[in-house]
From Swiss-Prot:
Its EC number is 4.1.99.17. This is Phosphomethylpyrimidine synthase. One of its GO terms (cellular component) is cytosol. The lineage of its organism: Bacteria, Pseudomonadati, Pseudomonadota, Gammaproteobacteria, Candidatus Pseudothioglobaceae. The gene is thiC. It catalyses: 5-amino-1-(5-phospho-beta-D-ribosyl)imidazole + S-adenosyl-L-methionine = 4-amino-2-methyl-5-(phosphooxymethyl)pyrimidine + CO + 5'-deoxyadenosine + formate + L-methionine + 3 H(+).
Length: 622
């Protein structure tokens, strides 16, 4: 990864495609109880209905993950990073301190290496840590009944002004499978859910740029997007661009899964420019530190890596602590064995040393680190099935049972925790996964990779997995990890990232509708109304991907006049069902009365026919 200072100077000029506002959309901010709680939303302006059904159409407000990148009033300079919106909240709590240097030996070595000057983020911040080993987690505050600014921010964000449309929704009743979804999300409800462990707020004290969000089954289903370099390619600039691209289209969190060179510097650039929580798999970097030799991994190296990443601002760690020595033989008869990178690393280490992993034996030590920075556990499913033939087997569920025990330990330390899940699971076996996770893990939030519902579609696994994602999201899964078309095939590019995010936004929204989440149907109703009224621009702009919708329409009807026509190229002007229905709706009273009178006469004739034993021909009276 040979990048020069000149390369990063160019990063101040962000690609226009990454930051241009969505069409007919404005970034608005809803203020909370204090001036520094400014909650972003995207307001989509709609055109008026014209003709005999004329009326004004109110703007629609949608949840927005794109940060300031789509705010036309903000100048973006990636070299400087984002504004620290949470810094005053963190300071006010008076339970953290600014360190004089990094606590990680590796971080200090990287800082002092002049050869890295060309790669380094220019404005390194000095890290914070809890004072006197205090606990600074959102769960710790919640258990004390403290409603933090982060919780208030999230309450405003989750409601997304939906009550303004309450009388217009006509929302279909959902099936939430015993979830506890209120009509209105309040700060108190969020505090209660976090205290019970049913929701998490990933918000490291060293990531003050993050816009607070929540993951839990009683909230909107969230999605994660994966990025990261590999030994075969990519650059820091490319990975930062992928992050911005992913959140533009709706990724609620981003995982940096880098396994190539300069992982530390890549992560710093991503975090400093990310308004969404960032997750990592620390064992990847720890393995790089021992030159890829699994047997040489140890607790000291892993501990230093955790501290290094916590002080950079990583919001959640995937930790494969549930892979036990006794589980490894259970995978022998599988078709695809162990497919998790982290899981295979820990399994190999356990076999090499013939003992439990240092992650499992030092789990409480890890908890002590997590609560000093408010890093959230994402307890990894290292033994997830890699094909539908291996779904729901004894190895997978054995690990899940171990994770259930680890959740209780994490909660004892007031460390926020969610659980990772499969994988490849056929549709008829998906609900068992959700039910067992709720039972074993005390309703801690579930986070799944899909699951993929069939193995026959390489190149289309964003579709095979979105099917399972929608299903498990309906059953109660709190966050869905996207899958791109490149899954199993290669490192995704920007276009793959977009396709994966859009597929999973569809799955998450479908799950919200099925659960009956309050306000979930507002956008659907607005788009359906625009479609019926041939307001083409509104149709495009209300969609998850206005660019693609407009492109498909214009391929056959490119002229501007086509944007006001009352038909599309599918049916043409004579066979459009909605045009015909509109004509029916706009008939005048006399026409409708005439039709009704004809119908009355027809009904009379029908009754007469039935009275005469339904005879087609009747004898003539002589």
């Amino acid at each position: 990864m040979n990048q020069s200072n000149s390369t990063f100077k160019n990063m101040s000029n962000v690609n226009e495609a990454l930051i241009k506002p969505f069409p007919n959309s404005n970034k608005i901010y809803v203020q909370g109880s204090r001036k520094d709680i400014q909650v972003p939303m995207r307001e989509i302006t709609l055109t008026d209905t014209i003709g005999e059904l004329a009326e004004k159409n109110a703007p629609i407000h949608v949840y927005d993950t794109s940060g300031v990148y789509t705010d036309s009033n903000v100048n973006i300079d990636l070299r400087k990073g984002l504004g620290n919106i949470r810094v005053s909240w963190i300071k006010e709590r008076n339970d953290t301190e600014i360190l004089t240097e990094f606590s990680s030996n590796f971080s200090n070595e990287r800082r002092d290496d002049v050869q890295l000057n060309a790669l380094r983020f220019e404005h390194l911040q000095v890290p914070r840590r809890a004072k006197d080993t205090k606990n600074v987690s959102q769960m710790h505050y919640a258990k004390q009944g403290v409603i933090t600014p982060e919780m208030e921010y999230i309450a405003i964000r989750e409601n997304c002004k939906w009550q303004e449309y309450k009388d217009q929704i006509g929302q279909k009743k959902g099936e939430s499978f015993d979830a506890n979804i209120p009509d209105l999300i309040t700060s108190e409800f969020i505090c209660s859910e976090v205290a019970k462990g049913r929701a998490v707020i990933p918000a490291n004290i060293n990531h003050p740029e993050v816009e607070p969000m929540i993951i839990g089954r009683n909230f909107m289903v969230k999605i994660n997007g994966n990025i990261g370099n590999s030994v075969l390619g990519s650059s820091i600039e490319e990975e930062v661009s992928k992050m911005i691209w992913g959140i533009r289209w709706g990724a609620d969190t981003i995982m940096d899964l880098s396994t190539g060179k300069n992982i530390h510097e890549t992560r710093e650039w991503i975090i400093r420019n990310s308004p969404v929580p960032i997750g990592t798999v620390p064992i990847y970097q720890a393995l790089e530190k021992v030159n890829g030799i699994v047997e040489n991994l140890n607790w000291e190296i892993f501990r230093d890596t955790l501290i290094e990443q916590a002080e950079q601002g990583v919001d959640y760690f995937t930790i494969h602590a549930g892979v036990r020595l006794k589980h490894v033989p259970l995978t022998i008869d599988r078709v695809t064995g162990i497919v998790s990178r982290g899981g295979s690393i820990m399994a190999k280490w356990c076999l090499a040393h013939h003992t439990e992993s240092f992650i499992y034996t030092h789990f409480e030590d890890i908890c002590e680190i997590m609560k000093q920075y408010d890093v959230t556990f994402s307890l990894g499913d290292g033994l997830r099935p890699g094909c539908i033939a291996d779904a729901n087997d004894v190895a997978q569920f054995g690990e899940l049972e171990t994770l259930g025990g680890l959740v209780k330990i994490a909660w004892k330390h007031d460390v926020q925790t969610f659980i990772e899940g499969p994988g490849h699971v056929p549709m008829q076996m998906i609900k068992e996964n959700m039910d067992k996770q709720l039972e074993e893990c005390g309703e801690a939030p579930f986070y799944t990779l899909g699951p993929l519902t069939t193995d026959i579609a390489p190149g289309y696994d964003h579709i095979t997995s979105a099917i399972g994602a929608a299903q498990i999201g309906w059953y109660g899964c709190a966050m869905l990890c996207y899958v791109t078309p490149k899954e199993h095939l290669g490192l995704p590019n920007k276009d793959d990232v977009k396709q994966g995010v859009i597929a999973y936004k569809i799955a998450a929204h479908a799950a919200d509708l099925a659960k009956g989440h309050p306000g979930a149907q507002i956008r659907d109703n607005a788009l359906s109304k625009a479609r019926f009224e041939f307001r083409w621009e509104d149709q495009f702009n209300l969609g998850l991907d206005p660019d693609t919708a407009r492109k498909y329409h214009d391929e056959t009807m490119p002229k501007q006049a086509a944007k006001t026509s009352h038909f599309c190229s599918m049916c043409g002007p004579k066979f459009c069902s909605m045009k015909i229905t509109q004509e029916i709706k706009t008939m005048n009273v006399d026409e409708i009365a005439k039709i009704n009178s004809i119908q009355i006469e027809m009904d009379k004739k029908s009754a007469e026919f039935l009275k005469n034993n339904s005879e087609i021909y009747m004898k003539k009276n002589t």
